[in-house]
Amino acid sequence: MRASGILMPVFSLPGPYGIGTLGNEAFAFVDFLAAAKQTYWQILPIGPTGYGDSPYQSFSAFAGNPYFIDFRLLAADGLLTEAELPAPQPVGPVDYGALYQQRPVVLHKAADRLLASPTPAYEAFCEAQSGWLEDYALFMAIKAEQEQAGLSDWPDDLRTREPAALAAAKERLADEVDYYKAVQFFFYTQWNALKTYANSHGIQLVGDIPIYVSPDSSDLWTRPELFQTDGAVHLTSVAGCPPDAFAADGQLWGNPLYDWPRHEAEDFRWWKQRIKHATSIYDVVRIDHFRGFESYYSIPAGNTTAAGGKWVKGPDRAFIDAMHEALGQGGIIAEDLGYLTPEVKTMLAASGYPGMKIMQFAFDSREPGNYLPYTYTRNSVVYTGTHDNVTTEGWRATASPEDVHYACRYLRCTPKDLTEAMIAACLSCVSDMAIIPMADWLHLGAEARINTPSTQGSNWQWRLTTPLTSLLADHIADLTTLYDRAPAAE
């Protein structure tokens, strides 16, 4: 079925408390999507973030980001007083340092009220999520006690989960463990309410999960045997991407690599649990760096660039078969951008999952692949660009004149109209799903870029300051209907 949606991170929503949340503005965005005749709201990973603020480097593959908890909803539930709500702030770029200092103070007050008289809903949540929640809460409590030191810098007995040290920590940090569990209850209560509202208005949530976990995560700490580590939970190899036209030294991500033979020996149980969790909170799940299941780029731990890495064979079809067994064949988007061998293409075809097409890449002379629209298939998802791309207006301003000229010739438009023409090319193409970033619908420039890979500084900070008008919703709805992507009338 042809359909379309909008890419909009939760943190980019407007709102009074320094970052987008799961409150009024998220519900209003659902209303906007419905008015614009969209079917999907695609977001970025929603896990708790740490150093670098990247949603792709989370403390847990299962937990939710406390920054997204809406204080006004907590007040409505009687967990905060009006006097305890922070003063409203003008909408501007996310200041993660300020959030780190200010948010826990408010959340502790709400958690104390809940824990003084735990509700049946809270107790049921803790029981249902015990498979990851207990370890995550203890991990975060120890991390706080260690002054936020990364896992690799923890004392040996805590890092390696020596039983006596673990038991002592559970007793010593019992109150903080309860706090982190309460915060997760707040997050998932609000998340589930938003998802219910979205689904009731015909909007499906497209989630995003990184293929790898963070080196500073409860996942690595809890099950180090599932990763390429030594006996002391130190990484022996790390993840990344080889050098290419976009990054001369490649990309050194630094994530733990999986011990795939161990996963296969366990029938991929951890991955099945992860995907089942994701499909319980999202309607569709995009898996980042899907090609890493066929073969992955391995860099010796301690290297300062990705240039010295090598490709290593992954689980390939065995993983795909396990996912089909657990979930069937639907509900997954495979992020298949970058270097694709025939073996990767064979694996993707066997999965049945749609891959991704990036319209900007079609006209980028640095891109070796062919992303021109005539190459697309129905079983694919097309984007003007993703969170890793500059906005289309930004691309027009920064791409080579030759590339812009080629795009305008191909799309039969002037440079001034390039963004609208590229959006139309996405909506009109054969791909079953088309996703347009919110910033492109607003014709925003490079100031609205979400992330520049392999850089630090101003990533993951963009927030929406432009009003989403009924006029814009009508324009989007008109194009969506024109290209036969509007939901069927009830």
Regions found by a protein language model. Give the residues of each.
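Surface-exposed amphipathic alpha-helices with a cationic face
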Residues: 34, 191-199, 324, 348-349
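Conserved, well-ordered alpha-helix/loop/beta-strand core segments that scaffold catalytic motifs
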Residues: 180-213
